[in-house]
């Protein structure tokens, strides 16, 4: 598998599990982990408060298709009739420069990256129950019953792939889930193979003193 100076992590979850809120909190309290969230491209319209280039790169279907034709995506998928994709070169540049990159993508994108034989780790965020998941989806009060039904169906399909991931975090208590998420990412940075790659001189010098 291809190894980079930085670590690549993938976080997935069904809509309503609290993934985006957890990732935002992760970035705000990031004095130790030093991670960077990849910004995806999407064909869906901007929601109130979203900023182009910060939340997503909002592009047309034609532009997205051109990027597919030019093999510019590391992964892409169609979700709720909209396309989402991760641009390839920007990720490789960040990883090569030692940046720890987090991808906020679904199981389809995760499997596409797995097929590319890259070195990465995966985390799946679960809701505490199906009832709580539906409650969270209804909380915004903007969607019809049919839309909620479709989102629940999609969410359960997403959940069916959770065992394909390295780690599972249940988002029942937000603060605890955030600690778990931070702990998983930090543990990857402290693994022996990563430490040997980045601190080989120090480790070898200390061992030579034995």
Curated annotation (Swiss-Prot):
Family to which the UniProt record says this protein belongs: Belongs to the guanylate kinase family.
The enzyme's E.C. designation: 2.7.4.8
Role noted for this protein: Essential for recycling GMP and indirectly, cGMP.
Keyword Disulfide bond among record annotations: no
Protein name according to UniProt: Guanylate kinase
Domain Guanylate kinase-like: 6-186
PANTHER family assigned: GUANYLATE KINASE, GUANYLATE KINASE-RELATED
Binding site for ATP: 13-20
Alphabetical UniProt keywords: ATP-binding, Cytoplasm, Kinase, Nucleotide-binding, Transferase
One MF term in the entry's GO annotations: guanylate kinase activity
Pfam family, one: Guanylate_kin
Catalytic activity: GMP + ATP = GDP + ADP
Stretches that traverse the bilayer: none
A GO cellular component entry from the record: cytosol
């Amino acid at each position: 598998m291809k190894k980079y100076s930085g670590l690549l992590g993938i976080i997935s979850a069904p809509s309503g599990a609290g993934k985006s809120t957890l990732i935002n909190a992760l970035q705000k309290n990031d004095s130790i982990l030093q991670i960077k969230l990849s910004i995806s491209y999407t064909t869906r319209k901007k929601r109130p408060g979203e900023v182009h280039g910060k939340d997503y790169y909002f592009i047309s279907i034609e532009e997205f298709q051109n990027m597919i034709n030019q093999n510019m995506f590391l992964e892409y998928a169609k979700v709720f009739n909209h396309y989402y994709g991760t641009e390839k070169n920007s990720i490789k540049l960040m990883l090569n420069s030692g940046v720890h990159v987090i991808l906020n993508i679904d199981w389809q994108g995760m499997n596409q990256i797995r097929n590319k034989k890259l070195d990465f780790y995966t985390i799946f965020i679960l809701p505490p129950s199906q009832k709580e998941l539906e409650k969270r989806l209804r909380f915004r009060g903007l969607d019809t019953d049919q839309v909620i039904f479709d989102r629940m169906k999609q969410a359960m399909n997403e959940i069916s792939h959770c065992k394909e991931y390295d780690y599972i975090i249940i988002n029942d208590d937000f603060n605890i889930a955030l600690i778990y998420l931070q702990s998983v990412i930090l543990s990857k940075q402290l693994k022996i193979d990563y430490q040997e790659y980045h601190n080989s001189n120090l480790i070898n010098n200390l061992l030579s003193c034995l």
